[in-house]
From Swiss-Prot:
It is an enzyme of class 2 (transferase). It catalyses: N-terminal L-lysyl-[protein] + L-leucyl-tRNA(Leu) = N-terminal L-leucyl-L-lysyl-[protein] + tRNA(Leu) + H(+); N-terminal L-arginyl-[protein] + L-leucyl-tRNA(Leu) = N-terminal L-leucyl-L-arginyl-[protein] + tRNA(Leu) + H(+); L-phenylalanyl-tRNA(Phe) + an N-terminal L-alpha-aminoacyl-[protein] = an N-terminal L-phenylalanyl-L-alpha-aminoacyl-[protein] + tRNA(Phe). Keywords: Acyltransferase, Cytoplasm, Transferase. The gene is aat. This is Leucyl/phenylalanyl-tRNA--protein transferase.
Length: 233
């Protein structure tokens, strides 16, 4: 296994099965963040992650963290909180504010560079990247964003500036996504936060099998139209 240098003249990627074991999932470097290349990456189970000053790095880890939306773990305390929630949750109302929130709310630094922000703005404008916003009155207090692949949603990042705000974003999205035919959420790499919410590791090969099937599914035509998700009308 060796790290592949991508060409700027082709959006082709090597097979994810050729990714390095250490660091886990590193597959390629270089290329660019054009919409066509990003979409090709997601279609193949690959995503970009790199620090400021580094070349663009492309990853497909094994195992892969996923969340089945019906299996979101709703703790008793979160259930009580949500029943009296002070929040309003919307879809695709403030993509730019959400990705900037994810970029800025990282004490240890961020991988969401200005080039990443620009690239995902382009994907959003093309109808492929989407945001979930959590509002307290008129203030954005949390949210998440990611890339749609049919009935699979590739979660990229989330942030929280108030109690349970990011949990609320994921909970409400899971409920709405599942209700409309969504099947799986890609969480990329398992961490304590996503594990506490029900995410689990599966073999990369299984993830790629799910992706190949689910990306061909179609959600209702107006699913990604900007709207209020919570509270219901």
């Amino acid at each position: 296994m060796r790290l592949v240098q991508l060409s700027r003249h082709s959006i082709a990627f090597p097979s994810p099965e050729g990714a390095l074991r250490e660091p886990n999932g590193l597959l390629a470097l270089g290329g660019d963040l054009s919409p066509a290349r990003l979409l090709m990456a997601y279609q193949r189970g690959i995503f970009p992650w790199f620090s400021p000053g580094d070349p663009i790095l492309w990853w497909s880890p094994d195992p892969r963290a996923v969340l089945w939306p019906e299996q979101f773990h709703l703790s008793r305390s979160m259930k009580r909180f949500h029943q009296r929630s002070p929040y309003r949750v919307t879809l695709n109302h403030a993509f730019g504010e959400v990705i900037e929130g994810c970029a800025s709310d990282r004490d240890e630094g961020t991988w969401i560079t200005s080039s990443i922000v620009r690239a995902y703005h382009q994907l959003h404008e093309l109808g492929h990247a989407h945001s979930i916003e959590v509002w307290q009155e008129n203030t954005l207090v949390g949210g998440m964003y990611g890339v749609a692949q049919g009935a699979l949603f590739c979660g990229e990042s989330m942030f929280s500036r108030a109690e349970n705000a990011s949990k609320t974003a994921l909970l409400v999205f899971c409920q709405d996504f599942a209700h409309s035919g969504g099947k799986l959420i890609d969480c990329q790499v398992l961490n304590n936060h996503t594990a506490s919410l029900g995410a689990v590791d599966i073999p990369r090969r299984d993830y790629l099998d799910y992706l190949s099937v689910l990306r061909g599914y179609r959600l209702p035509e107006r699913f990604w139209v900007p709207r209020v998700l919570f509270p219901g009308g």
